[in-house]
Amino acid sequence: MISTFDVETSFQITEEGKLDPSPKNPDNFLVSLGINDEYVFFKHRDFKGIPNRKVIQDILDKTTLLVGHNIKFDLLWLWEVGFTYTGRVYDTMIGEYVMNKGIKRPLSLKACCQFRGVIQKSDLTEQYMKDKVSFQYIPI
């Protein structure tokens, strides 16, 4: 099975004013994880339940190819919070870099979608990120 996934995390603001969402920063945590049609909250201001880790691991266990944009970041978080996945991965950002054949183009997901003519939903988080509001505080 081919699966697509993305994580949203908290972040810290560095002394230089940059965002640090690293899973190795002990003050950061996983806010939510989306895989295929499932979206699971882990730690969010508006979420009071218990995250359904089993549904995520069951999908990962059936997955033969995991697809994501800048997937190294998402995989580090996946492993950091205790999920297992050892199958193949495809990174759309690296794929886009290779397809550019040395032409310098932005590699953000938004830029890649615009260049390829992919219709994208409006980015509801863009202003929050500009304002340095972490994902756990963005309304569900």
Regions found by a protein language model. Give the residues of each.
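Long, highly charged low-complexity segments
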Residues: 1-24, 48-56
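Active-site-proximal helix-loop-helix substrate-binding element of RNase H-like nuclease domains
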Residues: 25-28, 36-140
